[in-house]
């Protein structure tokens, strides 16, 4: 199996293709990307027959920015007979996956696929039973075994394959299902909530998103991101010349500072989180974020980089490389991750966590 399907936001297929070609090439897994505009997915076809499996095992999924999900697949199954779609699919998967832990019957995230998605949900139940009978799936769901993927690109037309549960997205179609909280002041709140789900393991939330932490929200108005911090019982400095939602001010947890987010300098030394969703050139935002991290003004940050119209992968890569270079120059170890989230539009969301200082005598445990 030499093909890898990568699901992405429709309209960002070229960026997804450029990224997987670049990062696979760095690992000497060579191939080419098949791209169809606004399809919501890319197929990376490796030149060597087993390199699809090698790619999804060895390249960390968390290092990808534009892919929501990925899985290795075989040849396209076409013209599935309406009276029996199951038998050909089971036949394709036998000998490829044994005792898989979960089945996901998916489509690309496009308007055209909405009707097909309804079919996929109905089709999952009988297909799961048949795959269990054939030994392709285990008799119970388990996160310790590979995920079996059946990816429909049209009625009667699908790819079959698998991903590794320790190196994929845990979400169906790579999309966390989040509900907009009615009391939140703007829909942007879902970006930060999704970022927490994507970047922070669930078993670390109590420690890293803890009650009583101090946080800063740069460019906070009207308070969509501040809302997520307040919901987790943090104390928040919300920095913006624009007004904050009164409902947030009434909590008593928010201090509104009428300042420019680029000029604000914190006075506290125990700020755990800084978040930022400002509409500004990505290079300017990256420089500000690097300044906060280098100076130790926060332990972790989540921020958005707005994307230009062209060369979007190159621009994001350049901005992330700049932040990494600044951290390296000042002897700071950090984890950097970036992802175009489901709730992002022409932007990507970045998470940086300071780990420890590489220089003796420096402490990050403020």
From Swiss-Prot:
Q: What InterPro entries would the database entry show?
A: RlmM_FDX, RlmM_THUMP-like, RNA_MeTrfase_FtsJ_dom, rRNA_MeTrfase_M, SAM-dependent_MTases_sf
Q: Where in the cell is it found?
A: Cytoplasm
Q: Which UniProt keywords apply?
A: Cytoplasm, Methyltransferase, rRNA processing, S-adenosyl-L-methionine, Transferase
Q: Which residues bind S-adenosyl-L-methionine?
A: 188, 221-224, 240, 260, 277
Q: Name one GO biological process term.
A: methylation
Q: Which domain of life is it from?
A: Bacteria
Q: Where are the transmembrane segments?
A: none
Q: Which SUPFAM superfamilies match?
A: S-adenosyl-L-methionine-dependent methyltransferases
What general EC class does the enzyme of this chain belong to?
Answer: transferase
Q: Write out the catalytic residues in the record.
A: 306
Q: What is its EC number?
A: 2.1.1.186
GO molecular function, one example? S-adenosylmethionine-dependent methyltransferase activity
What is this protein's function per UniProt?
Catalyzes the 2'-O-methylation at nucleotide C2498 in 23S rRNA.
What family is this protein classified in? Belongs to the class I-like SAM-binding methyltransferase superfamily. RNA methyltransferase RlmE family. RlmM subfamily.
User: Which PANTHER family did the record assign?
Assistant: RIBOSOMAL RNA LARGE SUBUNIT METHYLTRANSFERASE M (PTHR37524), RIBOSOMAL RNA METHYLTRANSFERASE FTSJ DOMAIN-CONTAINING PROTEIN (PTHR37524:SF2)
Q: Tell me the protein's name.
A: Ribosomal RNA large subunit methyltransferase M
Query: Can you name the source organism?
Result: Shigella boydii serotype 18 (strain CDC 3083-94 / BS512)
């Amino acid at each position: 199996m030499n093909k890898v399907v990568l699901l992405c936001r429709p309209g960002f297929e070229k960026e997804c293709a450029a990224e997987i070609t670049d990062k696979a090439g760095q690992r000497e897994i060579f191939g080419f990307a098949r791209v169809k505009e606004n399809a919501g997915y890319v197929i990376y076809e490796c030149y060597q027959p087993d390199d699809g499996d090698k790619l999804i095992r060895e390249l960390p999924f968390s290092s990808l920015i534009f892919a929501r999900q990925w899985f290795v697949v075989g040849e396209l199954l076409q013209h599935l007979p309406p009276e029996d779609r199951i038998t050909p699919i089971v036949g394709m998967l036998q000998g490829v996956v044994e005792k898989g832990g979960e089945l996901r019957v998916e489509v690309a995230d496009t308007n055209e696929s909405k009707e097909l998605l309804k079919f996929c949900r109905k089709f999952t139940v009988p297909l799961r039973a048949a795959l269990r009978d054939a030994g392709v799936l285990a008799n119970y769901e388990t996160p310790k075994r590979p995920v079996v993927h059946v990816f429909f690109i049209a009625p009667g037309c699908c790819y079959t394959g698998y991903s590794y549960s320790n190196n994929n997205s845990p979400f169906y179609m790579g999309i966390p299902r989040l509900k907009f909280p009615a009391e939140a002041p703007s829909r942007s709140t879902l970006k930060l909530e999704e970022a927490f789900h994507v970047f922070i393991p669930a078993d670390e939330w109590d420690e890293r998103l803890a009650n009583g932490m101090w946080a800063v929200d740069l460019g906070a108005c009207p308070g969509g991101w501040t809302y997520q911090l307040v919901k987790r019982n943090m104390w928040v400095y919300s920095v913006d010349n624009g007004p904050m939602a009164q409902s947030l001010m009434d909590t008593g947890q928010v201090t509104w500072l009428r300042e420019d987010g680029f000029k604000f300098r914190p006075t506290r030394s125990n700020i755990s989180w800084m978040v930022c969703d400002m509409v500004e050139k990505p290079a300017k935002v990256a420089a500000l974020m690097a300044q906060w991290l280098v100076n130790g003004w926060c332990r972790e940050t989540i921020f958005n980089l707005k994307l230009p119209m062209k060369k979007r992968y190159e621009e994001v890569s350049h901005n992330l490389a700049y932040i990494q270079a600044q951290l390296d120059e000042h002897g700071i170890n950090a984890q950097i991750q970036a992802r175009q989230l489901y709730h992002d539009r022409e932007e990507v969301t970045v998470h940086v966590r300071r780990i420890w200082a590489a220089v003796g005598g420096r402490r990050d445990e403020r």
